[in-house]
Regions:
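Intrinsic disorder/low-complexity segments
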Residues: 1, 228, 267-270
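Core subunits and conserved enzymes of cellular information-processing
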Residues: 2-215
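Cytosolic, membrane-proximal regulatory domains of ion/volume homeostasis and mechanosensation machinery
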Residues: 11, 192, 196, 200-209, ...
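Single conserved hydrophobic/aromatic residue that forms the stacking wall/gate
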Residues: 260-272
Length: 272
């Protein structure tokens, strides 16, 4: 069943809202917690921290140049839609970094507790990355390289691909910054990779749903049009009443199975 133009438009708008919010979360983690502590978990932002330390070039300028080059690779190997959404993410992140540098300049870390800063420097970008991957986008940079590796090699986990692509940047931190910063960065990279996989796994987790109903048409229509999911149905009979029913089988995420969605159904149903 075809999806209407309005529904397609709403899906696209929703996707780009998620991308924009995810990038904002990532930028806050990177600018306020990662850059001031010289944490290098890899990626273009990690390279930006190294470049900003060694040269007069700003982090935002380096990020712009590197992301453009990697975006071209994304277009070639991962497709047009991925490149466009990642390009939007790159533009938003570059703009937000430039705004923070101009209006909220930092002379040092926000706190005197590196471990506390490390928690936020890991958690915010990792959660944001998982949200981006879940909608078929990325923040650009070495995330693009990681997704190319995952697509064209035998790697099954996004976190594993991220770890491999970002490891070189962390090793470089050993020579640019002090040993403690390098150790913090290595711990951060490892935990970030695990968090990305954990969040992605949770978001993609689906449950098999059996729906017993008398009228299959509105429910199948709802599942296919509103939730954009497939469904299979078969006639069945109640063991106690011997009345005929339909049993519909589908898979839904926790959000899709929530009361907010199922309450829209008008037909009496039994969901298990």
């Amino acid at each position: 069943m075809e999806i209407s133009t309005l529904e397609k438009t709403l899906q696209i708008v929703s996707r780009y809202v998620i991308i924009t919010l995810s990038i904002s979360i990532m930028t806050i983690g990177v600018y306020f917690f990662k850059f001031p502590n010289n944490f290098v978990f890899g990626g273009v932002t990690g390279g930006a921290a190294l470049v900003a330390k060694l040269t007069p070039l700003s982090a935002s300028a380096f990020s712009s140049c590197a992301n453009i080059l990697l975006l071209i690779l994304g277009w070639i190997f991962l497709g047009r839609d991925f490149a466009i959404s990642t390009g939007w993410a790159t533009v938003v992140m570059t703009a937000e970094l430039a705004l923070f540098e101009k209006y909220v300049p930092l002379s040092g870390p926000l706190s005197d507790q590196p471990m506390l800063d490390l928690v936020f420097a890991i958690a915010l970008p990792a959660i944001a990355s998982a949200l981006l991957f879940n909608v078929g986008a990325s923040s650009g940079g070495t995330d693009v390289v990681a997704l190319i590796l995952k697509k064209y090699t035998h790697m099954k986990n996004t976190g594993e691909a991220l770890f491999i692509t970002d490891l070189a940047m962390v090793l470089a931190a050993c020579f640019v910054f002090d040993l403690y910063t390098a150790l913090y960065s290595f711990v951060g990279l490892t935990v970030k990779s695990l968090v990305v996989d954990a969040v992605l796994e949770q978001m993609k987790m689906c449950k098999a749903i059996l729906i017993i109903c008398d009228d299959k048409d509105p429910i199948c229509d709802f599942v296919m049009r509103k939730l954009v999911r497939g469904a299979t149905y078969t006639p069945c009979y109640g063991a106690y009443t011997d009345r005929p029913h339909y049993m519909i089988y589908t898979t839904l995420t926790h959000r899709e199975r929530s009361e907010e969605h199922t309450s829209e159904l008008q037909s009496p149903v039994s969901i298990s």
